[in-house]
Amino acid sequence: MIELVIVSRLLEYPDAALWQHQQEMFEAIAASKNLPKEDAHALGIFLRDLTTMDPLDAQAQYSELFDRGRATSLLLFEHVHGESRDRGQAMVDLLAQYEQHGLQLNSRELPDHLPLYLEYLAQLPQSEAVEGLKDIAPILALLSARLQQRESRYAVLFDLLLKLANTAIDSDKVAEKIADEARDDTPQALDAVWEEEQVKFFADKGCGDSAITAHQRRFAGAVAPQYLNITTGGQH
């Protein structure tokens, strides 16, 4: 599915290659056989708007959206396992899937990075690729809702993936669930996370329990992302 390759490229950090190969991407969108006309048009508008931006501005926008906080992270398992030990095993299992299909990662790539997962799905037969999208549909809906809340044009990419997945997820209900969710990308929220990481570090070094408990209490209300249980259709 060439559409998955296109979205994968658009969800990667916008480097010089995006501008160099934009015409090829426009042509691939126009040749798509899996997108209704209106969806192909929306994808083309997204690409046009992105490539008319100054590259530095596009890169800053991307980093602010996807690299600050966890709520809009493109690491899939961040929204399922958080920092639990299950995440490591899930990574190993996904990496094994990639290797079975001949996809080799370099040492800097994480297997649950959404653009990489889409690239993997694009190599599969269409029916299997659609099933792979359905597997992550609750995460896609969550990311779409959070990006819409932030009035980001990137939300259109996640809505497009949900349509390709032909999923029955109610996006309006997902939006309602996160309506009152505190943002985790504010300076205050990021500072709280940094402070918490310092506590963990000092705890590992043998600090007294009472000091750690007192410090943690200060950040008991720090922003924490909601994690999904994908076995229940994405319910929190």
From Swiss-Prot:
GO cellular component assignments: cytoplasm
Keywords recorded for this protein, A-Z: Chaperone, Cytoplasm, Nitrate assimilation
GO annotation, biological process: chaperone-mediated protein complex assembly; nitrate assimilation
SUPFAM superfamilies: TorD-like
Location, primary (coarse class): cytoplasm
Gene3D superfamilies reported in the protein's UniProt record: TorD-like
InterPro entries, per database record: DMSO/NO3_reduct_chaperone, NO3_reductase_chaperone_NarJ, TorD-like_sf
Subcellular localization(s) per the UniProt record: Cytoplasm
Pfam family of the protein (one): Nitrate_red_del
GO molecular function, one term: metallochaperone activity
Summary of subunit composition and partner proteins: Binds specifically to the NarG subunit of the apoenzyme complex at two distinct sites, one interfering with membrane anchoring and another being involved in molybdenum insertion.
Its biological purpose: Chaperone required for proper molybdenum cofactor insertion and final assembly of the membrane-bound respiratory nitrate reductase 1. Required for the insertion of the molybdenum into the apo-NarG subunit, maybe by keeping NarG in an appropriate competent-open conformation for the molybdenum cofactor insertion to occur. NarJ maintains the apoNarGH complex in a soluble state. Upon insertion of the molybdenum cofactor, NarJ seems to dissociate from the activated soluble NarGH complex, before its association with the NarI subunit on the membrane.
Family per similarity comment: Belongs to the NarJ/NarW family.
NCBIfam families assigned to the protein according to its UniProt record, in alphabetical order: narJ
Protein name: Nitrate reductase molybdenum cofactor assembly chaperone NarJ
